[in-house]
Amino acid sequence: MANWISSKLKAAETILQQLDQQAADSLRKDEKSETHDEVFETSPKSGSSPVSLKDQLRKKTYEGSDSGSGSQRNSTEQKPSYLSSSKKVRKPDQSHERTSAPSQSLTQDNTKLTDNDWTELLSTPNQRTSTSTSRSPGGTSAIRGLKKDGKRHGNLGKNPLVSDGKKSSSSNVVNSRGRPQKQTNKEPSDKEVSSPSDADMKNRNAPRDIFVNSTHKESEKDVSGKTPPLDDSRRSANETLPRETSPSVGKRDGRESRRSSVWGKQVREEVSQSNVSDGLTRKESSLSSDESESDYESDSSTDSERERQREERRRRRERVFAEKVATKAVAVIKERENMVARLEGEKLSLEKIVEERAKQQAQEAAELQTNMMETLEAADLEKQKHNNTRMEVLTRLAGLEAENAELTRSLAAGQKKLETQIDQVAVLKQQVELKESTLEELKRNTFNIGGRGTTLKQLDTSRGDKFEHQMLEAEISLLTDKIGRLQDKATKLEADIEMMRKELEEPTEVEIELKRRLNQLTDHLIQKQSQVEALSSEKATILFRIEAVSRLIEENKGMSATEASSQDLEAGDWELSGSKFKPAFQDKIRSGKKHLGWLVMQLNAIFISGTVFLRRNPTAKIWAVVYLVCLHLWVLYILLSHSDASSSGELRSGAVISLENFSNSSLQ
């Protein structure tokens, strides 16, 4: 988006510059049009224009002048019939009868227009514009040839060359000799010859009528101040007319071919028209020289009145035309100013959009930074929770291991007791077996003892043996009971041992839950770490984009500051603002700021990681404090020792130098 806005700003600036250049060029052209060289350069261009406003106004003056003298009007309308056939030239009466009707139609069409009707003059039909356009090529070429001959040969004056130069301006000298008859007859012939090219160039040469009118005015002033010469000079001027128009056309072609190829095409068309018109003027001059001598004496009385009327009309026309040109120029200038103001408004709106986008990007960057901080804090909290749960699990595992060790110890002690009791039972069984063997021996002895005298004794002994036997049986029963109880205890201990083994081999529900919780926390931690990495990458990309956008904005500001210029539309002056070295200096400052900011960011990251590490490890805090204290003490020691050594060295060197100087002076 920033690139699009910058491209739009550049396009608007280029359009403004083009408009300013066009306005300055138009003003320069208006200033240069007052000189004679620009007049003669632009007059041939307007010669081939199909619709000339000045020619239309002149056509109206012809009709006004012809209304005063009907014979001259009829004679001016003879030329189209003359060009249609060479036989009708010798019979002016017949041509007059045939051409009276078209002359009346032309006068009726022209009388409908007024001097102040600008739109009707532009919307006139092609038949009238072609006749008016045929006057301008010959008129402009004749004016150029007239000025050159006026400088070289001062004796030519107002010959037929002057009459040819006044086809579009209707001068008084030509009318006094009756030349308007031949000139007006020449205009339809030029129309018949040059109408295809004039119709093609109708739209291309309309803007150049302003300069053509100025050239016609100057030509009328130059020609009206001279006196008519003899017929011989007129004929010589008619003969020299094509010779003088051709180099003028060559000059014009040479000048305009250097400007553009379009002007070259127009010049070639004008040359073709001028060649045709030159051929016609030669024929007309040879035929009209005889008739002009007869008409000159009859029209000499009305010359002064016609001159005054035509001068008044010409002045009035010039005044109206100048006012129209001025209003048109003011309208063009206003349009250009409005366009410039509109483009400036668009430029300001685009700048506002750029500023708003920059603000939005800054806000987004701030929001992203806050989100990053929040996510980092959440990740730290999750890490702390994970560490806490891990410590709890470790403590529980340590307790379970201690309980397991105690149980194994108690199992080993019970097994030892069981073994000792089993040994005791075995010993008691052996004793019981010995007693039983002794009892059987005693029984056999009692059966073997004979005699009744001894029976009592035997009975007493048997009774004692029985009593002992009972005692032994009681002891045996007690021992068997103890053995049963011990066996029960052994079975219970074995069952407990098996349960403990099962518990050790198979984890309990609590341990399973703890392991599941631990796995969930590790997965959550991995996800958080991936999110943190993604956010860090997004942050890096956003920072890169922010730097790029800021760089573009600064470059656009620098370009606008360096390329900002103010142009005076009336004078065409440019005033450039800014300096050439300012952007380079700003670029250096910007690069230095970027490097410094990068270093500060790196140091900040290092310090943040160090603070996090020290916050989690209290022993590291103590060692860091001790290291900093030792480092400061070492730096102070180095500084103090270096200052003492440098001061003592300076004193020693000064003392040695003074002793050497003293010894040298004493030796001398």
Swiss-Prot record:
InterPro entries: Golgin_subfamily_A_member_5. It comes from the Eukaryota. Keywords: Coiled coil, Golgi apparatus, Membrane, Transmembrane, Transmembrane helix. It is a multi-pass membrane protein. One of its GO terms (biological process) is Golgi organization. Residues 290-302 have a biased composition (Acidic residues). Residues 331-539 form a coiled coil. Residues 64-86, 100-113 have a biased composition (Polar residues). GO terms for cellular component: Golgi apparatus; Golgi membrane. It is found in: Golgi apparatus membrane. Residues 26-39, 184-207, 215-237, 250-259, 303-312 have a biased composition (Basic and acidic residues). Residues 123-141, 168-178 have a biased composition (Low complexity). The chain crosses the membrane at residues 594-614, 622-642. Residues 22-317 are annotated as: Disordered. PANTHER family: GOLGIN CANDIDATE 2, GOLGIN-84. The C-terminal domain (508-668) is necessary and sufficient for Golgi targeting. Golgi matrix protein playing a role in tethering of vesicles to Golgi membranes and in maintaining the overall structure of the Golgi apparatus. This is Golgin candidate 2. It comes from Arabidopsis thaliana.
